[in-house]
């Protein structure tokens, strides 16, 4: 403001009776127009406006705001008004009307009047995250902050496959497949830099996404498509081989149990500095994904020419039941905690109730009916409307110590944090995976529910999934936020639009609806 912007901005406004254009630069134009009402030009500059969201995130909450004027419209009962906006497009303001807009950008509503059906709304939302990277496609993990992350992109592909977007799915898998090296896949891609490979689940999600794709296609042709100098099939074999022998970054199969050791902060619960959910050892969802990968490997290499997949497959399934069940509670430990080199049989069970065990049901790694029921019954405690909490609000037997500059941030014996707000290192990070509710994992609960209860559980699962309508209609309309507070009233937090939140909701919605 003190450089003169408050004096310059009013001169950058061009108006007519229905709206205005704001052009701060020749390549940047904002057009806003009202349908029935009028625009009143009345420029105002407000100094040091307090913004509560920035304050909640521990950022500078005060900044100046500029308003060019206001819209005025007289409405009778039952009437509605539309305000339409575009950025650097639709330069002819006369064309800025509902009829002139592409179908996918017209006003949004869900299951109400002329609104969209749930699956239509979710399919539309998927396209917002697909981007070009070179000759292939990639996925923006979330707006406004994230880029293309390996784990998120590969989970997102499952929703694309469910939506019938097979070509896009293939190109994304080829994009990440070409980066596979010694059983690892990038955690994220920054320009041409794919050096960050601190993820034990991204290679396994790659296998799961490939399995979904060939299942939907009804053939294995995609596995023979070229990805650089190799085929997708060879890349999957490479992942299986190095999971067993060990990757350069420390992921390795325990030969005694067949389970996969994951270094600290290599799962989706990867918050670090301070270490909030290290999960070093044998995390349950990694074992479920490994089980599913072995099923795929056995399918595409039934004679075991590339490895003894079938024997390890049986070993993993038996080891999960033998080592993960908490005898007192009847559901699964979140992780068998151990340092590198310690066999799973000597690891310590982490009794924290988290939703990761749901993948043991959805991936088919646990099929014992009683255990599966115990899992979904326990995880029901974690549900909030449209999301599932990352940790139960209850004491834990195995303490979780979160320290920052020699200061303990939360009670190690009850680490649940129900509000995601405040300073990043001392407040938000400890809460991120320790009570914050996540949208992407919520559909997995509903998927597990129908796995356990079959057709009889369909209506209940659809009712739970339907609680996401509120999220689609609030915040970033037509999208699903990244996270919510674990505590009531479950305020939306994090990214306003999260790729895997949309894709998983669509995938499971279609799956459950088809039962």
Residue ranges and their predicted role:
Residues 1-515:
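Acidic, mature catalytic/reactive cores of soluble proteins
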């Amino acid at each position: 403001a003190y450089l003169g912007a408050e004096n310059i901005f009013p001169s950058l406004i061009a108006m007519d009776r229905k709206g205005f254009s704001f052009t701060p630069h020749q390549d940047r134009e904002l057009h806003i127009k009202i349908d029935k009402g009028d625009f009143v030009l009345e420029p105002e500059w407000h100094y040091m406006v307090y913004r509560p969201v920035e304050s909640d995130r521990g950022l500078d909450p005060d900044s100046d705001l500029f308003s060019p004027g206001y819209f005025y419209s007289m409405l009778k009962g039952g009437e509605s008004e539309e305000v339409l906006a575009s950025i650097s497009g639709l330069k002819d303001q006369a064309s800025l009307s509902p009829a002139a807009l592409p179908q996918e950008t017209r006003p949004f509503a869900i299951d109400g009047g002329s609104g969209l059906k749930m699956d239509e709304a979710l399919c539309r939302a998927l396209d917002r995250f697909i981007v070009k990277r070179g000759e292939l496609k990639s996925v923006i993990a979330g707006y406004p902050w994230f880029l293309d992350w390996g784990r998120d992109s590969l989970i997102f592909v499952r929703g694309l496959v469910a939506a019938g977007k097979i070509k896009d799915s293939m190109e994304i898998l080829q994009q990440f497949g070409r980066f596979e090296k010694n059983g690892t896949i990038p955690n994220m891609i920054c320009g041409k830099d794919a050096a960050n490979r601190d993820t034990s689940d991204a290679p396994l999600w790659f296998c799961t996404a490939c399995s979904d794709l060939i299942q939907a296609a009804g053939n294995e042709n995609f596995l023979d498509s070229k990805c650089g100098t190799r085929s997708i099939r060879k890349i999957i074999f490479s992942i299986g081989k190095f999971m067993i022998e060990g990757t350069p970054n420390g992921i390795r199969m325990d030969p005694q149990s067949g389970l996969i050791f994951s270094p600290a902060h290599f799962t989706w619960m990867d918050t670090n500095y301070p270490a909030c959910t290290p999960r070093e050892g044998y995390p349950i969802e990694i074992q479920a994904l490994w089980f599913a990968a072995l099923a795929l490997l056995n399918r595409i290499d039934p004679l075991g020419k590339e490895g003894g997949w079938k024997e390890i497959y049986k070993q993993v399934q038996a080891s999960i039941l033998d080592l993960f069940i908490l005898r007192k509670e009847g559901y699964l430990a979140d992780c068998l905690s151990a340092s590198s080199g310690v066999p799973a049989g000597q690891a310590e069970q982490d009794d924290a109730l988290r939703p990761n065990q749901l993948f043991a049901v959805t991936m088919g790694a646990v099929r014992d009916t009683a255990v599966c029921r115990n899992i979904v019954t326990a995880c029901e405690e974690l549900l909030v409307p449209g999301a599932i909490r990352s940790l139960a609000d209850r004491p834990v037997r195995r303490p979780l110590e979160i320290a920052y500059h020699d200061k303990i941030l939360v009670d190690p014996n009850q680490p649940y944090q129900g509000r995601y707000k405040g300073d990043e290192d001392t407040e938000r990070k400890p809460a991120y995976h320790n009570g914050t509710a996540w949208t992407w994992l919520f559909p997995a609960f509903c998927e597990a529910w129908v796995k356990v209860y079959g057709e009889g559980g369909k209506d209940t699962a659809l009712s739970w999934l339907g609680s996401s309508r509120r999220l689609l209609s609030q915040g970033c309309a037509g999208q699903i936020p990244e996270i919510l507070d674990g505590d009531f009233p479950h305020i939306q937090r994090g990214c306003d639009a999260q790729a895997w939140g949309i894709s998983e909701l669509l995938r499971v919605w279609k799956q459950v609806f088809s039962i």
